[in-house]
């Protein structure tokens, strides 16, 4: 059995785990779920479905580049990008929760030298991204979340 077959079979369980993570993160205002032992730091990304228009939340590993937050749209090395990536492409202005802080952000895809620099930064946060890159033929997007003025 290859990796993708195993991941496909376990996807319903993974969705329940992610929903539980999100619920605990929100219920504790980030006290539990933001930074846990042996895990990379996690934020909650709010996004609107590109097709459905439904509001969704995804717990995602993140890194920091100055004031910006950085995400990797790896989906574990699947052949397709994660749904949240398509949703951000359609609706780039959104909100994230980092610990107890809620931040209005604008999403964009990093390219060229910036992408390579941020990829290296994120591999430092979570080394598994290199394994994911080897599993897929697609270029895994690096997403930059730039803070937006509030008000």
Write out the residue ranges for each language-model feature.
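Short beta-strand segments
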Residues: 40-74
């Amino acid at each position: 059995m290859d990796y993708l077959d195993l991941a496909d079979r376990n996807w319903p369980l993974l969705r329940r785990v992610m929903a539980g993570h999100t619920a605990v993160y929100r219920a504790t205002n980030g006290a539990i779920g933001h930074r846990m032992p042996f895990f990379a730091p996690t934020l909650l990304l709010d996004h609107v479905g590109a097709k459905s228009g439904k509001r969704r939340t995804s717990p995602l590993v993140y890194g920091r580049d100055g004031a910006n937050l950085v995400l990797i749209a790896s989906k574990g090395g699947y052949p397709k990008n994660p749904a949240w990536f398509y949703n951000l492409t359609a609706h780039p202005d959104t909100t994230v929760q980092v610990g107890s802080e809620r931040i209005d952000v604008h999403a964009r895809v990093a390219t060229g030298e910036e992408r390579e620099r941020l990829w290296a930064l994120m591999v430092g946060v979570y080394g598994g991204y290199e394994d994911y890159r080897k599993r897929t033929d697609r270029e895994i997007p690096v997403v930059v979340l730039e803070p937006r003025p509030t008000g």
